[in-house]
Amino acid sequence: MQEKELKLTLLTNSRMLHHQGIELLKNIIRKLFWWKIYGPIGVLKSLDRGFQALKKEGINLTFNINPPITEIYPIVFVLRGADTLSYAISLKKKWIIKKLYAGPNISVPKDKHDIWFHPAVDQIIVPSQRVFDYHCSLDEKIWERMQICPAGVEDLGISSKRKKTLIVFKKTCPEALSDQILEYLQKKEISYHLLEYGKFTPADYQYLINQSRAMIYLQESETQGLALQEAWIKDLPSYVWDRWYRQYQDRHWEGNQISCPYLTKECGECFHDFAEFEEKFPQFWQKTLDGNFHPRAYCLQELSDKVCAKKLLNLSLWTDF
């Protein structure tokens, strides 16, 4: 007997965004400010690739992305925005949507946080344990409605043109820390490329990943760390600054690996300040040159597009695919 077809819709825009002129404007904005929407767009592209891969393996799956209201399927995942989630809730009230999932990786402003608890939302899907714990620290009742599922990363193969060069990925960190690290690398005569968030393109990043051996990652916090995963899938280990806490407006939360929720010993190591950076970096760099890290193998097993898409289906739909 043929397996029942699974039909689902991925939403990132509300119904007003289907007009061609608005979509054209949004595409221009994406090109100009890609780094500010990299997360949601990256998640959408990952699920698209992952679902396509599962279909090729024989899973009876049909899905669409931001369709007109007449083509929305009964199962819906909202990937971006409180307005889009509100729109989806209105469709569920009209019985157009039967199962509604907020996520994965949806961000909701503090003043609209209550929309997560709307009875029409069947489940909230967050990208990491770090995000799960953070939201539970703010509201104890939310844990029963949350599940964890990361977004995957595309496998584009690895390069044979690597040099003894580092990427220093500077996203959000104190200037004093980044200055000390760059000065250290210069004194040790270690070649590096500095990438500052918002000042390069995805193509620039992919090019440098293919040319480099490892990455120093400077960021206060990550919900998941897709940029890290893109390095790992290329077999680049990461030396990540982790300051142990997150501060957002009046909220303070502490925990381990806030900057790198999916970092493992196969993928690299953390440091907490410059003193620890200076102490541990020689060992990290030598292990890198000796090939003692294996981030690509870990990423292929746990964080590929297909693996994460399959996790999402298993998690949210309670079906073992």
Regions found by a protein language model. Give the residues of each.
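Alpha-helix C-terminal capping/helix-to-coil transition sites in glycosyltransferase folds
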Residues: 71-73, 119-120, 210-212
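Conserved catalytic-core segment of nucleotide-activated headgroup transferases in glycan assembly
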Residues: 31, 37, 134, 147-202
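Catalytic binding pocket for nucleotide-activated donors in carbohydrate/polymer assembly enzymes
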Residues: 220-302
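Active-site proximal beta-strand in glycosyltransferases
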Residues: 73-108, 125
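N-terminal pre-catalytic "stem/leader" segment of glycosyltransferase-like enzymes
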Residues: 1-86, 306-315, 320-321
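Short acidic alpha-helix that forms the nucleotide-activated donor recognition element
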Residues: 201-212, 233
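A short, active-site helix/loop in glycosyltransferases that binds the activated sugar's phosphate group
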Residues: 109-114, 120-143, 176
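Acidic donor-binding loop of glycosyltransferase active sites
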Residues: 207-223
